[in-house]
Regions:
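PP2C/PPM-type serine/threonine phosphatase catalytic domain
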Residues: 1-253
Length: 253
C-alpha cells in the first residue's frame, strides 16, 4: 500500500493550553486524534495517555493475531479489529487509573478517533465528538457519528441541525475515554480504494470550517498542505478551541 500522511495541531486563538493530541505511525498505518476534557491540565494528560497507549499497544497486539483471548472474552472480530478494540480498552484503563491515583485530575477524559490501514481495509475506532471523514470520488463522507448530546437529539429528530449548531449544550459529549470502565467505542471497517483521502479531526476544526470547504481542501491539496490550510481556516474564523487534523492519502491500495 502506498500512502502519505501529515498531521498538525494548534491551540487556537482563545486557549492557552492545547488539550488535543495526535498520533502518526506510517510504518504501522496507524493514525489518531484525541481531544481532552477535564480542565486543570487533565485534558492534556488524558489525550496524551490515549495516543501514547494506542501507539505502544498496537504493534504488539497486531503481532499477536493468533493469541488466545483472555478468559471470559470472546474474539469474534477480524484480528485488526480485535487489536484496535484491545488498544482502546488499554487506553481507557490507563486514563481511568491515572484519574483514580491523581486527586488533582478528577474529571479528566478524552475523545479518540483512530484509523488503522491494513490488508486493504480501513479500521476506525471512535469515541466522543472528534471525527473521521473520507473524501472519495469527489464526495466527503462523515464516517463517525458524534457521541454528543446535540448529535443524539438531531438523530432522534428533537433538534434540527441549526438548533444543534447554536445550542449551549453543543460541546456536551456523552461518551469519552477514562470516564467509565467500559469505553463503549464504536469500531467500523471500510474497503480501501486508490486515491482515498481520510481526515481525522477534533471539533475545533469542524465547529469553524464547513464540510464544503473541507471537501475543496482535500480535493486539491497534499496532506501537508491540507492540514496547514484547515488549521489556518479554523483560526481565521475565530479559533475558539484547540484544532487538530490528520490527513492520510491512500495513493495506491
Amino acid at each position: 500500500m502506498k500512502r502519505t500522511a501529515f498531521g498538525g495541531t494548534d491551540p487556537g486563538k482563545k486557549r492557552v493550553n492545547n488539550e488535543d493530541a495526535l498520533l502518526l505511525n506510517d510504518t504501522l498505518g496507524l493514525y489518531a486524534v484525541a481531544d481532552g476534557i477535564g480542565g486543570n491540565e487533565g485534558g492534556e494528560v488524558a489525550s496524551r495517555i490515549a495516543v501514547e497507549t494506542l501507539g505502544r499497544a498496537m504493534p504488539d497486539l497486531l503481532g499477536e493475531k493468533d493469541r488466545t483471548p483472555p478468559v471470559g472474552r470472546v474474539r469474534a472480530d477480524d484480528p485488526s479489529v480485535s487489536a484496535l478494540r484491545e488498544a482502546v480498552f488499554l487506553a481507557n484503563r490507563a486514563i481511568h487509573q491515572e484519574r483514580s491515583q491523581n486527586a488533582a485530575l478528577p474529571n479528566m477524559g478524552t475523545t479518540l478517533t483512530a484509523l488503522l490501514l491494513r490488508d486493504k481495509q480501513a479500521f476506525i475506532a471512535h469515541i466522543g465528538d472528534s471525527r473521521a471523514y473520507l473524501f472519495r470520488a469527489g464526495k466527503l463522507l462523515q464516517l463517525t457519528d458524534d457521541h454528543s448530546f446535540v448529535a443524539e437529539q438531531v438523530r432522534a429528530g428533537t433538534f434540527t441541525l441549526e438548533q444543534a449548531r447554536s445550542s449551549p449544550y453543543r460541546h456536551m459529549i456523552t461518551r469519552a475515554l477514562g470516564i467509565a470502565k467500559d469505553a463503549q467505542a464504536e469500531l467500523t471497517t471500510r474497503a480501501l480504494k486508490n486515491d482515498d483521502r481520510f481526515l481525522l479531526c477534533t471539533d475545533g476544526l469542524t465547529e469553524m470550517v464547513a464540510d464544503a470547504e473541507i471537501s475543496r481542501v482535500l480535493a486539491s491539496s497534499s496532506p501537508q498542505e491540507a492540514v496547514q490550510k484547515l488549521l489556518a481556516a479554523a483560526n481565521e474564523r475565530g479559533g475558539v478551541d484547540n484544532i487538530t487534523a490528520v490527513v492520510v492519502w491512500v495513493v495506491e491500495v
